[in-house]
């Protein structure tokens, strides 16, 4: 099947039968199209055609029967729907000569051609339609994927890497053949060596590879875009390796992903000045504490840092080489980037916005002023702006696909600017000389999918689906509250959005009144960021220190809170349902959340999520509630899990396990520890820079100790609970009384590993060792002193 034959024809007409002349002519046209190797889809009703155009993106040409007055307006509405959704395939009207005058001007604007059944032969009409489809399909060929597809169709015989030679090597082995059939032949044929000159150079950015990145830059609002093939972890390292040299000051959001630590501090050798951040009682990741963004506070932090040796650093006009900001956290806290620019921009040469979790913000107006490439008023005194995005997270790309967007022409000619040639030297340090071409092609295609009206429609649909899903969850919860006679059963999972919001009061000029969030129309909720805002003092979000308009919760992150904490006070309740238990149940029922914390579950919303999947999620959550309330045996609730750990869980009941685990975390006061370890007063004392501490680890000048024995010692690894991948202790920090919440938090996880096997978290920088008595103990490396 060639490139063009991957597209189909849609015929929308009430008559396809060959027992009348019109039906016979249609059959002959469709048969001629099929004879040329194309598939034809038939829709007798306009409603069926509407479903087809919204669900089948392979339609390359549509033929619509105009009928009597446009089938009472239905044909016109179908055509308008297609164009409104940004669908640009050719539309050809099947029309009778006497009804041609019925077609209104607004429809004529959308039409590419006409078929009069009484004229021309079926074979000629079919050729004309195929020609139109090919012209349309040609416009969809993206720079790199188009060239890759053309090369694949040439049938070139390759004597190059990779050794599997288009998959043939795999076909010589039974399991290799199965592997090849599982993935499909095309991915092996497209796995090419960089000696294929027709595709350009992915490292020096030439040919189709360069053109793909140029067009992506235009689509995402950047001046220059780099495609990166080993994740945003690598993108951040590329950017920060290009910007930061040993001793440079880095203004560092304590919410940053571990890759930012690697790039700026462990590889670059930068000296951090940290911005403390908020957590709520559920452990959700909140914004930077507003007071810490004040210039005077930041300059005071520079002056107070024992790592800053330059006595004049705090008074320099631009003390920081770069500020690194987690623009969208894993839990969906998104900043107003314009406000951050106004606050910290004058202090920095560059700002790196890590948008790994929100590469879609360019494509919906609700995110206005919240993404780096949309920043306004960038003059010669502004910092250079860089954004990194994990296109594989919620955009359409293969895993590990990432991109770097740059806007820094406004500082051209200034010494602080890193021009392309120097930046690319850093790119080359972190890029493989054997890139995976299908991965690069996925970045090219993923960008083009967002082009024009199409991207806006896709993300608007997604946000609306998320709103409707949250409304349904609130409705289910309300029903349980109203209908359950037993108070113990009056609960359900609650979406992390406001309980009530303020709207204008039509009865009082300038007045407002509060209404339930879910009572607002989907149009309102999908268009105004104020209904997603973390407003200071609002109980629903639980963040103590906020500034007006600083942050919102992301409509495309569906966070569900589990019972166990009073949402108003943040205090533990008598009984709770830990999220790890819910997540395990869902996985065994083939519903896989993105992540869970102790009291929350995260589900990602993308254009790949459909209503049926949303309905399945609601049903699974209701089923879990029934099993919990009936205190069902774990053997029945999660049999696969119990079968792996029968000694601990066989015969245990679901509600009892939830209560036991909840009581454990309540006794350890985990909720308070999660908040405390990111507060300014608990950020550990820095004894040396992260880079210096990491050298001790490399040279093996370290002691390997259980965490019970590291008081007063200097860390050499990042202590990272994963997810979300945020460091609680950084190399070079001395573990003293200030770090008590971090150590207490990790010790609680250590005890939980032994009490609740199978529900443990991934913790990087610490290592599980089993002592002589069979107890798991966490160990780590500290500087040998």
For each feature predicted by the language model, list its residue ranges.
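A short, charged/proline- and glycine-enriched loop
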Residues: 2-9, 57, 88, 222-223, ...
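Conserved acidic segment of CheY-like receiver
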Residues: 2-33, 42, 62, 92, ...
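Short beta-alpha junction loops
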Residues: 15-17, 93-100, 120-121, 356-365
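Short acidic, S/G/P-rich loop/turn micro-motifs used as interaction or catalytic elements
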Residues: 15-22, 47, 65-74, 97-100, ...
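Non-catalytic terminal extensions of PLP-dependent enzymes
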Residues: 31, 48, 53-61, 75, ...
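A generic structural motif
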Residues: 33-43, 270, 591
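Conserved PLP-enzyme active-site core in the AAT-like
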Residues: 43-46, 51-55, 65, 76-80, ...
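Conserved N-terminal alpha-helix of the aminotransferase class I/II PLP-enzyme fold
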Residues: 185-234
């Amino acid at each position: 099947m060639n490139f063009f034959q991957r597209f189909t024809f849609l015929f929308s007409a009430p008559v396809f039968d060959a027992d009348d002349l019109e039906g016979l002519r249609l059959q002959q046209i469709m048969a001629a199209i099929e004879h040329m190797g194309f598939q034809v889809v038939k829709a007798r009703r306009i409603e069926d055609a509407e479903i087809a155009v919204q669900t089948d993106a392979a339609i390359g040409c549509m033929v619509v029967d105009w009928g009597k007055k446009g089938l009472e307006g239905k044909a016109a509405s179908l055509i308008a729907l297609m164009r409104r959704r940004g669908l640009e395939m050719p539309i050809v009207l099947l029309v009778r000569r006497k009804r041609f005058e019925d077609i209104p001007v607004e429809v004529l604007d959308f039409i590419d051609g006409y078929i009069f059944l009484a004229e021309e032969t079926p074979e000629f009409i079919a050729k004309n339609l195929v020609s139109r489809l090919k012209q349309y399909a040609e416009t969809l060929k993206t720079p790199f994927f188009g060239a890759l597809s053309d090369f694949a169709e040439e049938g070139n015989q390759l004597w190059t890497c990779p050794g599997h030679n288009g998959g043939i090597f795999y076909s010589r082995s039974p399991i290799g053949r199965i592997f090849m059939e599982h993935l499909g032949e095309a991915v092996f044929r497209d796995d090419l060596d960089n000696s294929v000159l027709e595709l350009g150079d992915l490292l020096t950015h030439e040919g189709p590879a360069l053109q793909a990145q140029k067009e992506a830059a235009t689509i995402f609002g950047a001046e220059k875009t780099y495609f990166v093939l080993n994740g945003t972890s690598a993108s951040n390292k590329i950017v920060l390796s290009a910007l930061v040299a040993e001793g440079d000051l880095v203004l560092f959001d304590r919410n940053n992903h571990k890759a930012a630590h690697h790039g700026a501090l462990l590889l670059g050798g930068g000296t951090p000045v940290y911005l403390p951040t908020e957590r709520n009682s559920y452990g959700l990741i909140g914004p930077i504490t507003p007071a810490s963004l004040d210039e005077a506070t930041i300059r005071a932090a520079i002056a107070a840092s024992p790592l800053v040796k330059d006595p004049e650093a705090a008074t320099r006009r631009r003390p920081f080489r770069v500020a690194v900001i987690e623009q969208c956290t894993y839990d969906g806290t998104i900043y107003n980037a314009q406000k951050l620019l106004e606050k910290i921009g004058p202090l920095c040469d560059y700002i790196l916005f890590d948008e790994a979790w929100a590469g879609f913000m360019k494509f919906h107006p609700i995110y206005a002023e919240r993404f780096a490439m949309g920043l306004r008023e960038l003059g010669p005194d502004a910092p250079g702006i860089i954004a990194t995005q994990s296109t594989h997270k919620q955009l359409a790309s293969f895993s590990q696909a990432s991109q770097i967007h740059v806007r820094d022409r406004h500082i051209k000619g200034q010494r602080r600017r890193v021009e392309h040639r120097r930046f690319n030297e850093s790119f080359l340090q972190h890029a493989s000389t054997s890139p995976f071409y299908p991965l690069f092609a996925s970045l090219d295609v993923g960008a083009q999918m967002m082009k024009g009206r199409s991207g806006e429609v896709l993300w608007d649909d997604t946000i609306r689906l998320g709103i409707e899903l949250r409304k349904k969850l609130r409705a289910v919860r309300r029903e349980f509250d109203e209908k359950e006679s037993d108070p113990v059963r009056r609960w359900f999972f609650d979406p992390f959005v406001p309980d009530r919001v303020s709207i204008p009061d039509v009865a009082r000029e300038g007045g407002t009144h509060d209404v339930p969030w879910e009572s607002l129309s989907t149009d309102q909720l999908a268009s105004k960021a104020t209904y997603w805002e973390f407003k200071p003092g609002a109980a629903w979000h639980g963040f103590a220190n906020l500034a007006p308009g600083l942050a919102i919760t992301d409509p495309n992150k569906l966070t569900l809170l589990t019972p166990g904490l009073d949402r108003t006070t943040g205090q533990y309740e008598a009984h709770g349902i830990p999220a790890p238990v819910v997540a395990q149940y869902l996985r065994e029922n083939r519903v896989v959340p993105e992540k869970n914390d102790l009291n929350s579950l995260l589900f990602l919303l993308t254009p790949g999520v459909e209503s049926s999947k949303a309905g399945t999620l609601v049903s699974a959550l209701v089923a879990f509630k029934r099993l919990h309330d009936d205190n069902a045996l774990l053997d029945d609730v999660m049999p696969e899990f119990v079968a792996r750990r029968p000694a601990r869980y066989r015969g245990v009941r679901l509600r009892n396990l939830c209560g036991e685990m909840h009581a454990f975390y309540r006794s350890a006061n985990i909720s308070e520890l999660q908040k405390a370890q990111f507060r300014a007063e608990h950020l550990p004392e820095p004894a040396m820079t992260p880079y210096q501490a990491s050298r001790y680890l490399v040279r093996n000048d370290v002691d390997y100790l259980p965490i019970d024995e590291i008081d007063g010692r200097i860390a050499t690894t990042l202590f990272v609970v994963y997810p979300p991948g945020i460091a609680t202790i950084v190399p070079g920090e001395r573990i003293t009384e200030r770090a008590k919440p971090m150590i207490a938090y990790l010790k609680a996880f250590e005890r939980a590993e032994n009490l609740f096997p199978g529900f443990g978290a991934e913790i990087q920088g610490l290592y599980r060792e089993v002592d002589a008595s069979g107890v798991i103990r966490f160990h780590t490396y500290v500087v040998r002193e």
